[in-house]
């Protein structure tokens, strides 16, 4: 009786002493189909995956960082290079912050038009279509730099009140969006463009000289022509913008 018990215990231990490793493929007789052992990791971490992850979280994306710097550089070339005094004097504009913003706004729009054109694709079988790309990204960076500069300048205005300053920025933002739409509509026709200039620069005043509006329209056409001549590669990494003088139009 004791021998039988000892024998049964030995057999029981031998049958269950081998533990099953559930992390490995099944090799027992219970597996009816063959199992192919994967030689690769469950999640393949390659350069493409890492790059996508970095883009998602906004880390270490060198190309986007360079493009953002391009956008900020492009904006800075407006207030640093445009001769505002010539615009004030030649076009009989008041030397005020509002006039400064209107002139800056126009030059920023010219940059936006050029960079948005970089995202327009066309082929022999398809019509032109717009696809958001680097041009759209740089455009947003230019606008971002504009508002950062505006907010900073308003703080230094004499007697500036923070609450009033925020309200002014909001109003300027609304005017900016309306101006962009109006200028865009005038791209293909001088009459519409002249109306947009008259409204934005002179508030539709009947006392304005027609030659002033015509001069601004001519400047816009000439400047767009010059911007269109800049190659795409230079536009991305080493943009050199030469702003034309309003006095030569």
What residue ranges belong to the model's regions?
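Generic detector of well-ordered secondary structure
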Residues: 1, 11, 18-21, 80, ...
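N-terminal mitochondrial targeting presequence
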Residues: 1-54
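C-terminal structured interaction module
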Residues: 2, 247-249
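N-terminal non-cleavable signal-anchor helices
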Residues: 11, 28, 36, 107, ...
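Intrinsic-disorder-associated interaction segments
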Residues: 20, 42-46, 64-67, 169, ...
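Conserved, aromatic- and glycine-enriched, well-ordered alpha/beta core segments
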Residues: 57-73, 77-103, 110-174
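A charged, amphipathic interaction segment
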Residues: 161-247
